[in-house]
C-alpha cells in the first residue's frame, strides 16, 4: 500500500514538472547534442538531465547523464509521446529500479519472505527453508530463481522451458524483463540474439529500449491513459507492491 501511495505521489509530482503541450507545435529552439531533435515530438524533447533528476530523485546527476539519450530514443522508437504516458513510464521505472540504481533482479529472500511473497504454489515450505536466507545461511539465489520461475508455472507464464531458465532469464533492466519468452520476443523485435539480451538490457541503451518495448507490447500505453497507476503496476509485476 505504501508503494502504491508513493508511486501515485511520484506520478503527480512528476506531472507537475512538465508544462502543458502548446496548442501549436513548439518551435525547435536549439538541437540537443544527445539526439536529433527533428525526430522527436515536443514531449520527447522535454527529456533532459533536469527532467531525469526529478524523475529519479534517489540517483545523481552525474550518473543520470548517460540515460538521457537512451530515454529519448526509446520513447521515440516505441511511441511514448504524451505527457501522461511519459510521466507514468518514468514513474514506474523509478519504483521498479530504485531510481535506476538496480538493473538486475535480486532474489536474496528470507525463508519467510519467499512464502509470503510467492506462496506455496510457487515454492514449498521445505524449499523455502532449504534455500532461503536465515540465520547462518545465505539465500541460494540461483536455485530460488529456478524454482520460482521454472516448472509448470515458469513454462506457462514466462516461456521458461529449459533447465536453468529461471536463473538465466531472471529480471534485468529498468522493467525487470523476465523469462525466456519476454527476452526472446524483445530480441526478435530489435534484431539481436536472445543470448545477448541479459547483458544488453543492463546498459542504458538496452535497458530503456527493453523498457519501451515492454511498455508497448504489454499495452501499458493504453493503461497509462486512464487515471492512476494501479493498472500499470499490476501489468508490470502482478501487483501494486513495487
Regions found by a protein language model. Give the residues of each.
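N-terminal export signals and maturation junctions of secreted/periplasmic proteins
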Residues: 3-73
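Extracytoplasmic/secreted envelope proteins and their assembly/folding machinery
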Residues: 4, 8, 49, 65-68, ...
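Soluble non-cytosolic domains of exported or imported proteins
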Residues: 4-5, 46, 58-66, 80-87, ...
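Peptidoglycan-targeting cell-wall enzymes and recognition modules
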Residues: 39-64, 94-213
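A short alpha-helix/helix-coil micro-patch that ends at or immediately precedes a cysteine
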Residues: 70-78, 95
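Surface-exposed patches in mature extracellular/periplasmic domains of secreted proteins
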Residues: 77-89, 102-106, 221-233
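Acidic helix/loop microenvironments that form the catalytic cleft of cell-wall polysaccharide enzymes
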Residues: 93-98, 179, 224-242
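Phosphate/ATP-binding catalytic cores across multiple sugar-kinase/actin-like superfamilies
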Residues: 217-218
Amino acid at each position: 500500500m505504501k508503494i502504491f501511495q508513493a508511486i501515485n505521489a511520484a506520478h503527480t509530482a512528476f506531472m507537475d514538472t512538465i508544462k502543458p503541450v502548446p496548442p501549436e507545435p513548439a518551435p525547435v529552439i536549439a538541437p540537443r547534442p544527445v539526439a536529433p531533435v527533428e525526430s522527436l515530438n515536443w514531449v520527447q524533447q522535454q527529456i533532459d538531465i533536469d527532467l531525469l533528476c526529478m524523475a529519479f530523485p534517489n540517483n545523481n546527476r552525474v550518473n543520470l547523464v548517460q540515460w538521457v539519450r537512451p530515454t529519448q530514443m526509446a520513447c521515440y522508437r516505441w511511441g511514448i509521446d504524451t505527457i501522461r504516458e511519459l510521466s507514468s513510464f518514468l514513474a514506474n521505472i523509478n519504483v521498479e529500479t530504485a531510481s535506476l540504481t538496480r538493473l538486475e533482479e535480486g532474489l536474496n529472500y528470507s525463508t519467510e519472505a519467499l512464502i509470503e511473497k510467492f506462496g506455496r504454489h510457487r515454492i514449498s515450505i521445505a524449499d523455502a527453508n532449504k534455500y532461503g536466507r536465515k540465520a547462518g545461511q545465505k539465500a541460494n539465489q540461483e536455485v530460488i530463481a529456478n524454482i520460482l520461475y521454472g516448472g509448470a508455472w515458469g513454462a506457462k507464464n514466462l516461456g521458461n522451458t529449459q533447465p536453468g531458465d529461471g536463473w538465466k532469464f531472471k529480471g534485468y533492466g529498468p522493467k525487470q524483463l523476465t523469462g525466456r519468452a519476454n527476452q526472446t520476443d524483445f530480441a526478435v523485435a530489435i534484431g539481436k540474439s536472445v543470448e545477448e539480451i541479459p547483458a544488453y538490457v543492463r546498459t542504458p541503451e538496452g535497458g530503456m529500449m527493453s523498457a519501451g518495448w515492454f511498455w508497448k507490447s504489454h499495452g501499458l500505453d493504453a493503461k497509462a491513459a486512464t487515471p492512476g497507476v494501479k493498472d500499470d503496476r499490476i501489468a508490470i509485476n502482478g501487483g501494486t507492491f513495487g
